[in-house]
């Protein structure tokens, strides 16, 4: 994330790391930094604070940013910046979104014509297998993870960050990663954009045509005191007030928001929304991406797309501005059915009617957000379970249906007890291959649906 406080940064001003410090980092990068902090002071030539930052950074990157972790010589920023940066998986997803705009079905809707798109000899693993003869501007550079993937798609890319230390780190790392045609600017992104808006010759080609501009922002979601903010307008920079400027300059604008934000509020406050991407990794909602286009009136009329993404699953639908509530409830037997549990992105979107219509399934009840099918479904965005028994909360029924079950995974949906309270009442330990869903059915009865996982 751009615009973060860079507290505790121990990075040398010139990024030159002496040999003892470099060797110490390499030797101990798999060790516990808490223990190292007490034992590392034995060698006076080792820059211990810097070394510990690098070891912690690499340990985070090993899982979050494997490409970076495998690149020798990468300099990592303080822990806060590492926590806030995108993962490699979500950064690659943003790159995939770009592909849809500039070379996919959406290319006709973008100011970038096909003549601007060129094939390259890169593999998908290295980055984009194509480039746009255009400009990327990341106005809130931060550690530069998203920039490192998006910049591979453009012939020119500009990373803007007002923290001088992060700029030095970015310049160093981009060189190691083989990123060419990138410019690192130590400035406030919005101030720079305002300057360029007065004279946008930087987008003009030698023959007088205009290059497409793609702007990316990741506004800080904390105030000056470090407290989280919960309104889009309270983020820094305030993207709501900046929309006219952004759309006057760019053909497309991508804004990364907290997954805690309501996408409906984002659409209300940000004119020109063409796409909303709710991005989850391993069923945990990580990012809310909002893409703006320079045609707000047309988009309001025709609606926009909502992409519910979880790893390789992508459930996309067009939202016309009105919620549909045509959700049919199952009023028959649940036994023997397939229980469908939507993934985190679908849950965040709240698009349950669209889901039911697309797959022809019934809801257990309007507010339970669990669905039933007579068979397994291909490409369903979520998990699927075989229902082996259904029990009321009657003691005798519970005893009969739970006989022999000592361990189970328990979830509650629209149910008057917490997981812990229910587990205590049922006297069942956590784990095993049984999944119990406690919920409320169409007639307001509380039931336990006992299942085994299929997908």
Label each region the model flagged.
Residues 1-455:
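SAM-dependent transferase fold signal centered on methyltransferase-like domains
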């Amino acid at each position: 994330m751009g615009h973060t406080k860079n507290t505790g940064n121990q990075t040398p001003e010139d990024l030159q790391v002496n040999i003892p410090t470099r060797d110490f980092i390499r030797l101990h990068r798999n060790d516990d930094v808490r223990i190292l902090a007490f034992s590392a002071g034995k060698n006076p030539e080792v820059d211990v604070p810097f070394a510990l930052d690098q070891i912690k950074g690499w340990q985070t990157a090993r899982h979050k940013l494997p490409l970076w972790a495998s690149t020798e010589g990468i300099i990592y920023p303080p822990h806060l910046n590492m926590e806030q940066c995108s993962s490699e998986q979500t950064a690659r997803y943003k790159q995939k979104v770009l592909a849809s705009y500039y070379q996919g079905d959406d290319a006709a809707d973008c100011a970038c014509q096909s003549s601007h798109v060129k094939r390259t000899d890169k593999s998908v693993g290295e980055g984009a297998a194509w480039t746009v003869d255009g400009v990327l501007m990341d106005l809130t550079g931060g550690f530069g993870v998203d920039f490192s993937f998006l910049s591979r798609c453009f012939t020119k890319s500009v990373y803007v960050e007002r923290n001088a230390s992060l700029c030095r780190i970015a310049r160093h790392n981009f060189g190691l990663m083989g990123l060419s045609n990138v410019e690192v600017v130590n400035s406030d992104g919005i101030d720079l954009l305002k300057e360029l808006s007065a004279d946008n010759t930087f987008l003009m080609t030698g023959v007088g045509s205009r290059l497409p501009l793609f702007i990316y922002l990741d506004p800080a979601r904390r105030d000056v005191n470090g407290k989280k903010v919960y309104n889009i307008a309270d983020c820094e920079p305030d993207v709501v007030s900046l929309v006219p400027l952004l759309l006057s300059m760019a053909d497309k604008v991508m804004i990364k928001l907290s997954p805690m934000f309501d996408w409906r509020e984002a659409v209300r406050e940000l004119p020109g929304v063409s796409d909303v991407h709710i991005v989850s990794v391993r069923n945990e909602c990580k990012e809310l991406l909002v893409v703006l286009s320079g045609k707000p009136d047309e988009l309001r009329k025709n609606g926009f797309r909502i992409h519910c993404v979880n790893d390789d699953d992508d459930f996309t639908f067009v939202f016309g501005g009105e919620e549909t509530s045509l959700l049919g409830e199952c009023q028959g037997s649940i036994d023997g059915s397939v229980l469908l549990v939507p993934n985190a992105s679908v849950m965040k979107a709240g698009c349950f009617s669209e889901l039911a219509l697309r797959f022809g399934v019934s809801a257990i009840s309007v507010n339970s957000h669990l669905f039933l099918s007579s068979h397994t479904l291909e490409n369903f965005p979520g998990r699927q379970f075989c229902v082996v028994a259904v029990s009321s909360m009657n003691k005798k029924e519970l005893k009969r249906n739970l006989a022999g079950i000592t361990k189970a995974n328990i979830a509650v949906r629209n149910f008057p007890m917490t997981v812990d309270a229910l587990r205590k009442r049922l006297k069942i330990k956590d784990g095993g291959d049984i999944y119990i869903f406690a919920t409320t059915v169409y007639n307001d009865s509380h039931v336990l649906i006992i299942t085994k996982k299929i997908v």
